[in-house]
Amino acid sequence: MKAVKMCLFFLFAQAGLCFAQQKQFKALLVTTTKGWHHESLHYGVLAIKDLGVKNYFDVVLLENPNGFTDKYLEEFQVVIFLNTTGDILDSAQQRVMERFIQSGKGYVGIHSASDTEYDWEWYNKLVGRMFQIHPVIQTARIKITDDKFPGLQGFANDKLWTDEWYEFGPEKISGLNYILTVDESSYDPRVQWGEKKGVGMGKQHPVAWYHNYDGGRSFYTALGHLPAIYSDPVFLNHLYAGIFWAATGKK
């Protein structure tokens, strides 16, 4: 009888262990940079790993894209580009990313993910809009433009936010759903880099958006330049909502 009880104990223990290891989804966190390397990258990695612990999803860090293959990506539901810059994937790896999204999975771009892969038209459409220029870091007012998307509660009532405010080029694809904008009357968008000038984007200056693309899902937020942002619960709630939607399609 004692032996039977011991067997049952181990069976239930193993079943409990298997159950405990079942996570909501698995995210691949890509941090490759071939251009500017953000000081905040380290803090972003820690923050997203902590989001995984708190919200019960797995996070795997990929700093070198050499392992970016169809086989490797099979186990993931979402790929996150955290402050990536420059041309980080070769042509074969680009096709892998395309097939990943076409299989019904998701992408999340954070801040300088829009300063990545300018010559890859498919990726430009995946992100939706590409970075052009930015003024100095300033405090400005953020406005919610779609309160039906989750994770935006902390931005209510024209919240003041300090960040690097990207000015974007034209839409690369129609159907972008804007969820946050920045009020240009609350900061100075003017900037000049040599012959390149920034004058702002007017009343509709997007900061975050999402859309369905090529069979999968894409979420992008321009917030996330400064290290301190990655310990702000308002930003982390916003970021997790985007990750969750991109991975699952649920709001």
Please place each PLM-identified region on the residue numbering.
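Extracellular ligand-binding/catalytic regions of CAZymes and related secreted enzymes
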Residues: Q22-F25, T31, V53-F57, Y187-D188, ...
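Bacterial Sec-dependent N-terminal signal peptides
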Residues: M1-K23
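Extracytoplasmic/secreted proteins, especially bacterial periplasmic and envelope-associated proteins
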Residues: Y43, A47, E75, A92, ...
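Catalytic beta-strand/loop cores that center a nucleophilic Ser/Cys/Thr
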Residues: P135-D214
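Hydrophobic residues at beta-strand termini and immediately following loops
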Residues: L62, T181, T221
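Helical hinge/lid and interdomain linker segments adjacent to catalytic or ligand-binding clefts
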Residues: Q24-T116
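A glycine-rich, often tryptophan-bearing local segment used as a flexible ligand/cofactor-contacting loop or short
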Residues: D87-N157
